[in-house]
């Protein structure tokens, strides 16, 4: 496949990967921890931080247009092969586990239409019927992407537009129903009994996750029609997502008082729609949630398959995963990715285990490459503007790692350790097997040793 992804397709890929299931629960999530004043401050800080990260990606695509797949290649080029591999491995692993959760959420949302007190068909998305349905959806998307990334991206563009319809309807109705006295009631959150700055921190513990996927266009940059579109698509998608999040959370506080909104069950947007337009509102949001998550799942499947392909081309993953089919789709890495997702689905059903801890740890691994984006720009920047953006992106990246929980970052060595063994095997599969550097050997040794106590802490 030739480089055919235009600005619209790239923007949709990024926006769709960010707008998943979370936006439909944001009203309650935010109202539970923060007042309108804290929300305005929290979104302001988050907005500046994510825009700095998006600008860092934009500048890197202009300064180093030769580097495809950003998240992996920026880390490799700036900080060595081992750091590059860990960035790719952590990103891919997070994408796999996130895709499992998307499939579970889809069928949990479908239970709104199929389940009743007498019949539990899909339940919370972990019944055997839900797992069978999720498996069918998994392999339908698999063969869709095998037809070519351009085909999948075109469908994703349509899905992104479709998911914006219920969100747009919600915003319009919320503007009409907005009542300023309701919004300003207890504006600083006295009833919460928490200082405003503590409320701000609590909002940012939520907002740090809603922009995961911002790197989508950079990951598939090798397939862009024009490299300049990559950075612009990232910036446009961030601005669009930030606008949606701001409108959804702030307008909701003018429809219902914060204490009442905080008690709603999720997806809270459905309850608000019922209040504004009757029982059909819940149906619209449930359908919108399903379309939204399916679109996000398609985006993440494309991105998850692209990373092993690029890593194999740079000799960080086994040579096998550099294979592409006649349509230039990353066939080998797609099989690896979706086979891993399928195994996880079966394990969830068979064990009935809660994988939320694993999802949290893996999600933290995706934040490390965000910091490395800023660090790489700082390393190669010459102009004062570029350096200033790089410093800001680094600070925001460090904040993300701190706010999401340093302990989870430490526990992530449990997932990095098998990756290191995979890295050592991968090097043997390539003709040019370059010897490890001394410091790389030390880091590998430390990771393997640290994995033992980390595993004990995780299972105890």
Predicted regions and their residues:
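Helix-loop-helix connectors at the membrane interface of multi-pass transporters/channels
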Residues: 76, 103-132, 166, 223-227, ...
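A generic transmembrane alpha-helix motif of multi-pass inner-membrane proteins
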Residues: 384-460
């Amino acid at each position: 496949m030739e480089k055919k992804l235009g600005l619209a397709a790239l923007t949709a890929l990024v926006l769709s990967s960010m707008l998943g299931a979370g936006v439909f629960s944001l009203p309650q999530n935010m109202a539970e921890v923060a007042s309108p004043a804290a929300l305005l401050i929290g979104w302001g800080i988050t907005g500046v931080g994510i825009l700095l990260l998006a600008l860092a990606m934009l500048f890197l695509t202009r300064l180093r247009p030769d580097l495809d797949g950003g998240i992996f290649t920026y880390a490799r080029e700036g900080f060595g092969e081992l750091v590059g591999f860990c960035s790719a491995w952590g990103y891919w692993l997070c994408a796999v586990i996130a895709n499992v959760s998307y499939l579970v959420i889809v069928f949990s949302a479908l239970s709104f239409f199929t389940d009743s007190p007498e019949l539990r068909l899909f339940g919370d998305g972990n019944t055997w019927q839900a797992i069978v349905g999720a498996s069918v959806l998994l392999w339908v998307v698999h063969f869709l992407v095998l037809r070519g990334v351009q085909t999948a991206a075109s469908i994703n563009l349509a899905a992104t537009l479709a998911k914006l319809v219920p969100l747009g309807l919600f915003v319009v109705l919320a503007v009409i129903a907005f009542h300023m006295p309701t919004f300003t009631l207890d504006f600083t959150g006295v009833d919460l009994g928490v200082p405003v700055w503590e409320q701000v921190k609590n909002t940012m513990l939520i907002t740090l996750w809603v922009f995961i996927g911002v790197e989508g266009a950079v990951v598939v940059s090798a397939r862009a029609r024009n490299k300049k579109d990559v950075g612009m698509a990232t910036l446009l998608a961030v601005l669009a997502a930030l606008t949606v999040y701001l409108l959804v959370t702030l307008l909701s506080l003018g429809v219902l008082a914060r204490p009442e909104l905080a008690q709603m069950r999720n997806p809270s947007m459905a309850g608000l729609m019922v209040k504004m337009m009757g029982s059909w509102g819940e149906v619209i949001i449930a359908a919108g949630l399903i379309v939204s998550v399916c679109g996000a799942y398609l985006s993440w499947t494309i991105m998850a398959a692209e990373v092993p392909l690029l890593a194999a081309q740079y000799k960080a993953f086994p040579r096998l995963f550099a294979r592409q089919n006649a349509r230039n789709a990353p066939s080998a890495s797609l099989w690896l990715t979706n086979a891993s997702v399928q195994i996880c689905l079966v394990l969830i059903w068979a064990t009935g285990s809660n994988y939320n801890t694993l999802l949290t740890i893996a999600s933290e691994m995706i934040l490390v490459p965000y910091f490395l984006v800023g660090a790489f720009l700082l390393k190669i920047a010459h102009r004062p503007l570029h350096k200033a953006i790089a410093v800001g992106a680094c600070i925001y990246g460090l904040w993300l790692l701190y706010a999401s929980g340093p302990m989870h970052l430490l526990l992530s060595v449990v997932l990095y350790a098998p990756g290191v063994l995979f890295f050592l095997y991968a090097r043997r599969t390539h003709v040019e097997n370059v010897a490890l550097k001394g410091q790389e050997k030390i880091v590998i040794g430390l990771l393997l040793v640290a994995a033992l106590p980390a595993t004990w802490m995780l299972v105890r």
